[in-house]
Amino acid sequence: MNSKILTGVLFAGARGFGASQAAPDPGDGSIKNFSFGPAAITVPVGTTVNWHNNDGEPHTVVSADGLFRSAALDTGETFSFKFTKAGTFKYVCTIHPRMVASVTVK
C-alpha cells in the first residue's frame, strides 16, 4: 500500500514539473514566411517590443510615421523599440512592402 501512495505522489510531482511554458511576452513579434506575427500587437506604454527575424531572408521594421527604423535584419537578428507614448503605429518591411503590421500602445 505504501508503494502505491509513493508512486502516486511521484507521478503527480512529475506531471507538474516542467510541464508548463511561460507565455510569450506580449511585446514580442516574429518575422517568418514573409510576414510579421502577430499582425497586430497591443502593449502598455513603456513596453519594449522585440522583433525577431526567424525567416531565411533579411527584413526591416520601419514605422510609417518615421518613429522607428531598423537596419536590415538577417536571420536570427532582433530589433527592439521602446514605446513611450500611446497610439497606433503601423510598420512595414521596406524590402518586402507587402509585409505590414501595427502596434497599438495604450
Regions found by a protein language model. Give the residues of each.
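Extracytoplasmic copper-binding redox domains, predominantly the cupredoxin/blue-copper superfamily
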Residues: N2-K106
